[in-house]
Swiss-Prot record:
Native organism: Picrophilus torridus (strain ATCC 700027 / DSM 9790 / JCM 10055 / NBRC 100828 / KAW 2/3)
Cross-referenced InterPro entries: Ribosomal_eS17 (IPR001210), Ribosomal_eS17_CS (IPR018273), Ribosomal_eS17_sf (IPR036401)
Entry protein name: Small ribosomal subunit protein eS17
Gene Ontology biological-process annotations: translation
PROSITE patterns assigned: RIBOSOMAL_S17E
GO cellular component: ribonucleoprotein complex; ribosome
Pfam families referenced in this protein's UniProt entry, alphabetically: Ribosomal_S17e
Taxonomic lineage: Archaea, Methanobacteriati, Thermoplasmatota, Thermoplasmata, Thermoplasmatales
KW Ribonucleoprotein (keyword) present: yes
Length: 76
């Protein structure tokens, strides 16, 4: 069973990813480093790590969705 993240974590993470395309990837440590620079002194370390974790999952989910859509169209 996975942990359920609060909606504010999801909302913040999705907004950050959508407003900054191409910056984040599937690497949690990289995403955490980028977020620490973006959100400096605005959130706690625990919250920042939760956002970085969801950003990572969100990126993976988007890529998986894009891949399945391409397969359905017969392009892959």
């Amino acid at each position: 069973m996975g942990s359920i993240r609060p909606s504010n974590i999801k909302r913040i993470a999705e907004e950050i990813v959508d407003n900054n395309p191409g910056i984040f990837n599937e690497d949690f440590e990289n995403n955490k480093k980028i977020l620490s620079e973006m959100l400096k002194n605005s959130v706690t370390k625990k919250t920042m790590n939760a956002i970085a974790g969801y950003v990572t999952r969100y990126i993976l989910k988007k890529k998986s969705k894009e891949k399945s859509e391409m397969e359905q169209l017969g392009l892959a």
